Amino acid sequence: MAVRLSIALLLSAIAMTSAGAADEPKSFACNFAGGAAHVYEKGQFVPEKATALSFGIAAIDNQAQTAELRTERGAGTLRVVQAVNATHFLEVVTEGSLHITTIFDKDDAKGAYPAVHSRHFGFFGQPIVTQYHGFCEAKE
């Protein structure tokens, strides 16, 4: 009896996980109006204003942990990491830069998904870090 109950609970959990994954958006349009940048110069990080940023995330496959980055300049490959209340998208750029986008659960009152985008890279040996905050909208 206990074995049947355990199996039933396990199957219920799997069914709920599969149903939840099916409801997740397969693509997003993300807009980041605000942000901050810090450039390392002469032994310290100097703040600079970051310009607005927009891009898309498409072909999200949580099972394979992959997605596509879509920008005006082309497409790139993303790695997907699922969290409890968010999804992280990691882009490792050819030059070794790391870009991370985190899209949190939908804010039903706003109708959009709060999001943060961070970039860690260097330019001619100078570290530059940026962080943006904004929203993503689910696309079909």
Give the ranges of each region predicted by the language model.
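Low-complexity, intrinsically disordered Gly/Pro/Thr-rich segments
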Residues: 111-124
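Edge beta-strand at a domain terminus
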Residues: 121-140
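Bacterial N-terminal signal peptides
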Residues: 6-15
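Hydrophobic/aromatic beta-strand elements that line small-molecule binding cavities or substrate pockets
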Residues: 55-58, 100-108, 133-138
